[in-house]
Amino acid sequence: MASPHSPSHASASFLDALDGGPRLPADHPPIETGRVGVLLVNLGTPDATDYWSMRRYLKEFLSDRRVIEVPRLVWWPILNLIILTTRPGRKGRDYDTIWNREKNEGPLKTVTRSQAELLAHRLAEAGDRLVIDWAMRYGNPSIASRLEALTRRGCERILVVPLYPQYAAATTATVAD
């Protein structure tokens, strides 16, 4: 029997949970079950390091009421007249120092994609019944676009997994919104 900490035990437990119980005996007749999507969600990253890409990303991120809890009447001029005119250039230069040039993307996108690919590989025994994908709360690929893609791929249920280490309204709650 596999150790409770072994990879095969972990994936078997996960698959059991999806099925609603323990695995069936080998001689049991097949049971049709629908596809399940697992969507890993991380915070986000701009599409590029140029001024307009950074501005678009910062506007989406800093317009979220869960992230900035200042009254809109006060926040709108600060965001649009100060932050979005001065910060995109500076933040773009900062991002440029850590940008993944090989894939032309931010490091968080690279890491999140890799996590989804590794999870899909580890859970491959589920066959095409389990579909793993990933999204960004701010930026691309968006949660909405990936939920739509999972639905098009025939997923009857979708489990959304925020990749944050703890609960906070500005992170986990905004994914659920």
Roles of regions detected by a PLM:
Residues A2-D177:
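Active-site-proximal alpha-helix that buttresses catalytic centers in soluble enzyme cores
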